[in-house]
Amino acid sequence: MVVFSEDHIQETRRRGRIEVICGSMFSGKTEELIRRLKRAKFARQRVEIFKPAIDTRYSEEEVVSHDSNSIASTPIDSSASILLFSSDKDVVGIDEAQFFDEGLVDVCNKLADNGIRVIVAGLDMDFRRVPFGPIPALLAIADEVTKVHAICVKCGNLAYATHRITKSEKRVLLGEKADYEPLCRTCYMEALKEETENK
């Protein structure tokens, strides 16, 4: 039988690391983030969750997955604000990280260097397949990367990218299933070709 002392538990809690969960829309990124954070809470770890204040699709003060699972969060405008609320936490979760400024990379490093487990979820590419916001740099410094996949709505294979259905060219357009669809590489290229022909 193994017995863990309180000192051992504290030491284990204070090992900082950065975990990034990325993929297309509808791939389960937020679902996985919520799962990990709820497990940490169950283990009596001190948890704080952040999301960009601009993301009010389902709730202003909760992180909510497309499957309606949710967890209370703190909406913020700047990544620097994360440091103000995190010094006494064991685990920090950050959803929709692609919408934060590039300073998020330094913030995550500082938190991890100070013994905090940081779990970040976000889109790795925008609808044009361009790496999105601070996510590429976070992937580079992460201790662990989990790439999750949606299912292509056209053929049923693993989705590779998010295709925007609406006509807007704005890079940031908060939307749902009426605005975006996950597609595999082949179906994505076919959709682009069709859009070009219809112009």
From Swiss-Prot:
It catalyses: thymidine + ATP = dTMP + ADP + H(+). InterPro entries: P-loop_NTPase, Thymidine_kinase. It holds the Pfam family TK. GO terms for biological process: DNA biosynthetic process; thymidine metabolic process. Its main location: cytoplasm. ATP binds at residues 23-30, 95-98. The active site is at 96 (proton acceptor). GO terms for cellular component: cytosol. SUPFAM superfamilies: Glucocorticoid receptor-like (DNA-binding domain), P-loop containing nucleoside triphosphate hydrolases. Zn(2+) binds at residues 152, 155, 184, 187. GO terms for molecular function: ATP binding; thymidine kinase activity; zinc ion binding. Keywords: ATP-binding, Cytoplasm, DNA synthesis, Kinase, Metal-binding, Nucleotide-binding, Transferase, Zinc. It is found in: Cytoplasm. Its EC number is 2.7.1.21. Belongs to the thymidine kinase family. Homotetramer. This is Thymidine kinase. The lineage of its organism: Bacteria, Pseudomonadati, Bacteroidota, Bacteroidia, Bacteroidales.
